[in-house]
């Protein structure tokens, strides 16, 4: 035990208790009021001395102040003027203040102004009231007294500051606290503030010397007392139970020094071995706690615990340990507040909550970053060790065996621990990101993550990504504008997968920026407006593997391209590669949304990013234009519902005829794809192209070829006849078709285009011309088939007109004209016009009014042409005889005349009326077209008979004529008795059937039959008949 030096005359018990000015003392005698206590030399004061002291100690007069004073009226005036100005200024500024403030807020501000002004007047009022209590209302006394108080207060304050500076200067003094306090007591009071027990404190060697009648305390007695107290304390410590935390103690100076490392040191003492311990001094063993606890209150609580408990030291440790933990937790709370408000974590990067009841602090860091803000730090008391610990709650750190999760010795080291935790957390995030293969490690700076970002199609450059350890946000070193746009997205990522996805989008946008820049420099136009609801489906980005891939569709075109047609670049990016697919498509806008109207899914080209160069982009302008034209035609054909197929290059070279590729065929030149790179072929189904016309099935081959020559800007449609047609033998330069020399049956239609937007119009033009050609060929074929004779001849052949002759004895230039009426797209109608001199011209109204097929018209004209020629001959002969007999009419008055009238009810029934007004008879001969069955075959025949409407009796003059026709023409052939035939024999007639009441014959026999009947009916009439023609009626067939 080490001893301490005390002032002479002080007992050991007093020395043990001198550490506190207001400490409770077990044995304390009253201090006598001697002269030595107040520092007087004379032991006794006389009456004269007292009177003299009273006279000399009378208070001096208060210094009078005459400067810096003004009348009270001036003060009241100035205060009134100030009040008026403040109120008026408030009224003016209230009008221009924020209108969003409520009326209650404005009223509260005005009320605060009034209270402030009222307080100023109230101070002045109170001052006046105080001054009235002074004799004669002398204000100067009040002013002088206030000035004296200020001066005195300044002196006292200076002394206090001097003492504080002295106390700070003695902080590092090597004297014990007890001796230091005793020295200060001696310095300020002239003696220690301890009970003397009637001893005079002195350091002289004379033990029996008296001072003012009191003996000095001997030094040996003081030392002996301290030794006795040490023995008493040692015996008492040994006789009671102490906790293991109190094993580190030291007994000296009459007290026991108990030290708990890292927590506190407490000094206890006692009077004897039967008395309990009492508090002497307490000291915390960590810095910054001088102003955090109240030592007098702690002394009272500790003495109460030592007095009342059976195991005082156990209870004392439990109390002080809990007190220290609470104090340490509160100190950590204050330190965290300082770090959050004014320290390195200011700005909301660190937030904590302090729960004093649960002795718990929960911290959350990296509040501005989403990736690591879900972890937290907990500071509290460990249940096992009952020590203050800091626990880092992080799932990834728990799996790592090399990172601490629990920290002790937290007090004073909070900032360092937080720095270590944030550094370890950044290492975890960095290791997680490196394991995904997206980043690379920087050898120079381990805290940097390198991400390879393309700068061109062939080169990449690393960008440096770091984590700010204070805020937890990611940032790029030397960022570009594009990187700055993605920093906020990176910091909003909540998982490493999200962060990787953001970086992949960054890489994809950089690739898009590079490609767009290359296309812009070479004259392309990149559309930034088109946004599809669903991305283009690709072969790379399928459903099975699309989770790790990102896609962006670019729509690029040239200004000269057809409207709405684009080169679509589909960029599919992954962690390690980038694939670009090229397609041709047509994009339209409907109802405010972009939609793909046509997309080429067959000729999809896939390229790597490294293979794209400026040379290839320039070559795309020509090759893509060719494909655009192809797909424009394909799209147009699809709209026309025409089945089509694009011919592959191999098919073009190896399988197709050479005349489809070259105008002048040269067998010596070998086929190669390079020779025909400027030519594309599309096969077309003929029937769908001509909208299902059946007339072409026997004329043209079912497959046609549409050829595009991009070098000559020419479009051709190739076709082929199935067989040689009669149209080939006709001279027609206006057909606008070109025949192939080496393929007699092959032909083509050709047009030259200058505007790409008008290519679709050529399909309509080709379809119109082709339909016109088919119809024209079919008409010519049917004409030759129906009018197959030596006297049939096509006079003129034009695309819309066919003129021909088919009558045997025709003297006109043409007998019939067929006009093909077309509109802008298709064949509308066919019209048949008979010439005016044509014997069949009488049926023209029926042809015009009824919509007959031209095949029926041709067959009808051919079948009835002998009939109408015969009728014309009968009428012309009668007309000639009429002119000859007109001259003899006056001389021969006894002649009778028979008139012949031709009438048409419809195209299947005609009548010849023989009328003789002199003899008073009328004979009607009916000619009908009927379908009959001959030997099981149905044929069209003429049926000639007399009308049943006219009742001719035997007395009529016409009866002999009718009877003769029936007997000689209509009746079956019978022989007379002498063996001669009883009927007239019809020469050159075949297929004649006598029916008794009439006769049936074909077109070849109708002339002979009709001429024989006409001869009989005119046989008895010696006069020329009067011939008239009745206009046809509107009856239908």
Swiss-Prot record:
GO terms for cellular component: core mediator complex; mediator complex. Keywords: Activator, Nucleus, Transcription, Transcription regulation. GO terms for biological process: negative regulation of transcription by RNA polymerase II; positive regulation of transcription elongation by RNA polymerase II; positive regulation of transcription initiation by RNA polymerase II; RNA polymerase II preinitiation complex assembly. One of its GO terms (molecular function) is RNA polymerase II-specific DNA-binding transcription factor binding. It is found in: Nucleus. Belongs to the Mediator complex subunit 14 family. Component of the Mediator complex, a coactivator involved in the regulated transcription of nearly all RNA polymerase II-dependent genes. Mediator functions as a bridge to convey information from gene-specific regulatory proteins to the basal RNA polymerase II transcription machinery. Mediator is recruited to promoters by direct interactions with regulatory proteins and serves as a scaffold for the assembly of a functional preinitiation complex with RNA polymerase II and the general transcription factors. Component of the Mediator complex. This is Mediator of RNA polymerase II transcription subunit 14.
């Amino acid at each position: 035990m080490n001893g301490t030096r005390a002032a002479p005359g002080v007992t050991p018990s007093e020395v043990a208790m001198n550490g506190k000015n207001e400490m409770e003392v077990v044995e304390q005698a009253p201090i006598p009021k001697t002269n030595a206590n107040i520092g007087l030399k004379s032991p006794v004061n006389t009456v004269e001395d007292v009177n003299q002291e009273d006279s000399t100690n009378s208070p001096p007069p208060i210094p009078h102040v005459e400067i810096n004073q003004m009348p009270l009226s001036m003060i009241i005036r100035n205060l009134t003027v100030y009040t008026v100005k403040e109120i008026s200024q408030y009224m003016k500024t209230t009008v221009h203040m924020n209108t969003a403030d409520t009326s209650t807020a404005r009223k509260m501000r005005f009320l605060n102004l009034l209270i402030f002004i009222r307080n100023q007047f109230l101070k002045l009022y109170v001052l006046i009231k105080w001054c009235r209590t002074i004799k004669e209302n002398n204000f100067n006394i009040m002013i002088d007294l206030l000035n004296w108080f200020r001066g005195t207060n300044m002196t006292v304050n200076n002394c206090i500051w001097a003492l504080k500076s002295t106390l700070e200067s003695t902080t590092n003094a090597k004297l014990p606290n007890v001796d230091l306090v005793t020295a200060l007591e001696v310095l300020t009071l002239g003696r220690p503030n301890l009970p003397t027990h009637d001893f005079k404190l002195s350091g002289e060697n004379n033990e029996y010397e008296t001072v003012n009648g009191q003996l000095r305390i001997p030094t040996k007695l003081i030392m002996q007392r301290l030794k006795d107290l040490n023995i008493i304390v040692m015996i008492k410590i040994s006789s009671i139970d102490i906790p293991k935390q109190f094993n580190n103690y030291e007994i000296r100076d009459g007290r026991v020094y108990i030290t708990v490392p890292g927590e506190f040191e407490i000094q206890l003492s006692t009077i004897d071995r039967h008395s309990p311990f009492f508090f002497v001094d307490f000291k915390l063993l960590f810095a910054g706690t001088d102003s955090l606890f109240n030592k007098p209150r702690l002394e009272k609580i500790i003495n109460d615990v030592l007095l009342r408990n059976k195991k005082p030291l156990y209870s004392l440790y439990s109390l002080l340990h809990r007190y220290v933990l609470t104090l340490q937790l509160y100190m950590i709370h204050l330190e965290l507040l300082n770090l959050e408000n004014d320290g390195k974590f200011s700005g909301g990067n660190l937030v904590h909550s302090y729960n004093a009841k649960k002795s718990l602090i929960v911290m959350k860091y990296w509040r501005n970053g989403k990736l690591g803000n879900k972890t937290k730090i907990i500071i509290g008391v460990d249940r096992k060790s009952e020590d203050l610990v800091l626990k880092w709650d992080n799932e990834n750190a728990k799996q790592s065996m090399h990172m601490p999760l629990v920290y002790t010795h937290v007090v004073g080291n909070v900032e360092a621990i937080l720095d270590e935790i944030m550094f370890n957390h950044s290492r975890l995030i960095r290791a997680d990101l490196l394991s995904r293969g997206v980043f690379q490690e920087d050898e120079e700076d381990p805290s940097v993550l390198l991400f390879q970002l393309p700068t061109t199609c062939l080169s990449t450059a690393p960008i440096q990504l770091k984590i700010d350890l204070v805020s937890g946000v990611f940032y790029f070193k030397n960022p570009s504008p594009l990187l700055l746009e993605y920093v906020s997205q990176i910091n909003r990522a909540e998982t490493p997968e999200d962060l990787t996805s953001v970086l992949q989008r960054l890489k994809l946008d950089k690739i898009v920026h590079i490609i767009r820049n290359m296309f812009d420099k070479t004259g392309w136009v990149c559309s930034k407006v088109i946004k599809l609801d669903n991305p283009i489906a690709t072969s790379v980005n399928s459903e099975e593997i699309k989770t790790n891939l990102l896609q962006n569709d670019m729509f690029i075109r040239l200004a000269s391209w057809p409207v709405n047609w684009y080169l679509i670049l589909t960029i599919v990016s992954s962690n390690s590669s980038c694939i670009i697919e090229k397609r041709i498509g047509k994009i339209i806008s409907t109802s405010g949304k972009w939609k793909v109207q046509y997309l080429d899914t067959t000729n999809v080209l896939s390229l790597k990013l490294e293979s794209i160069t400026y040379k290839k982009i320039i070559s795309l302008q020509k090759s893509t234009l060719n494909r655009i034209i192809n797909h424009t035609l394909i799209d147009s054909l699809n709209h026309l519902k025409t089945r089509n197929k694009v011919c592959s290059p191999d098919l073009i070279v190896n399988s197709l005829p050479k005349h489809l590729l070259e105008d002048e065929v040269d067998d010596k030149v070998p086929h190669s794809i390079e020779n025909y790179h400027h030519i594309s072929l599309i096969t077309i189904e003929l029937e769908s192209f001509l909208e299902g016309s059946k007339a072409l099935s026997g004329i043209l081959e079912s497959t046609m070829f549409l050829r595009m020559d991009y070098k000559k800007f020419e479009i051709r449609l190739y076709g082929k006849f199935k067989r040689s047609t009669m149209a080939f033998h006709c001279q027609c330069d206006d057909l606008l078709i070109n025949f192939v020399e080496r393929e007699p049956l092959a032909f083509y239609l050709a047009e030259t285009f200058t505007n790409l937007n008008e290519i679709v119009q050529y399909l309509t033009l080709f379809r119109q011309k082709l339909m016109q050609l088919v119809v024209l060929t079919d008409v010519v074929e049917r004409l030759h088939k129906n009018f197959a004779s030596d006297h049939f001849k096509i006079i003129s052949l034009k695309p819309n007109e066919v003129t021909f002759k088919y009558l045997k004895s025709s003297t006109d230039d043409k007998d019939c004209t067929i006009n093909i009426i077309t509109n802008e797209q298709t064949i509308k109608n066919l019209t048949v016009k008979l010439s005016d001199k044509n014997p069949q011209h009488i049926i023209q109204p029926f042809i015009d009014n009824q919509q007959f097929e031209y095949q029926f018209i041709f067959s009808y004209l051919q079948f009835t042409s002998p009939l109408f020629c015969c009728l014309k001959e009968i009428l012309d002969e009668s007309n000639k005889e009429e002119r000859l007999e007109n001259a003899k009419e006056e001389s021969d008055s006894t002649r009778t005349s028979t008139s012949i009238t031709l009438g048409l009810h419809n195209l299947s029934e005609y009548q010849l009326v023989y009328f003789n007004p002199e003899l008073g008879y009328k004979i009607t001969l009916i000619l009908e077209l009927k379908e009959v069955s001959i030997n099981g075959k149905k044929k069209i025949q003429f049926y000639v008979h007399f009308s049943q409407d006219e009742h001719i009796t035997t007395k009529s003059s016409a009866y002999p004529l009718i009877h003769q026709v029936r007997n000689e023409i209509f009746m079956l052939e019978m022989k007379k008795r002498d063996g001669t035939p009883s009927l007239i024999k019809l020469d050159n007639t075949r297929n004649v059937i006598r029916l008794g009441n009439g006769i049936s014959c074909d077109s070849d026999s109708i002339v002979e039959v009709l001429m024989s009947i006409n001869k009989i009916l005119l046989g008895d009439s010696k006069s020329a008949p009067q011939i008239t023609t009745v206009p046809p009626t509107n009856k239908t067939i």
